[in-house]
Amino acid sequence: MATLPEFTDVQAAYERIKAHVTQTPVVTSSLLNAWLGHTVLFKAECLQRTGSFKLRGATNFLHHYCQTHGLPEKIVANSSGNHAQAIAYAGSMLNIPVDIYSTES
């Protein structure tokens, strides 16, 4: 069973990715706040370089992997969406060739 991350793990991940991802804004909706009677905050990850939050995880994983195991020869992933875009972008930042496979639908 995996262990839960500690705050120091979150800080380390932030340090690994901060130069490679966009610092996206937190926004709110006055209409939704009024309807719910509470303040609701949204993290606008749609403004990220690849259009989703997945870039944060892909960048963190690849940087951590490279720090602990060295640069891989190639990255192979299976995805047809945001994960594929994130892996491809993160791989290109590190000059690692990336092969993305996607199923036909």
Predicted regions and their residues:
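PLP-dependent amino-acid enzyme catalytic core
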Residues: M1-S105
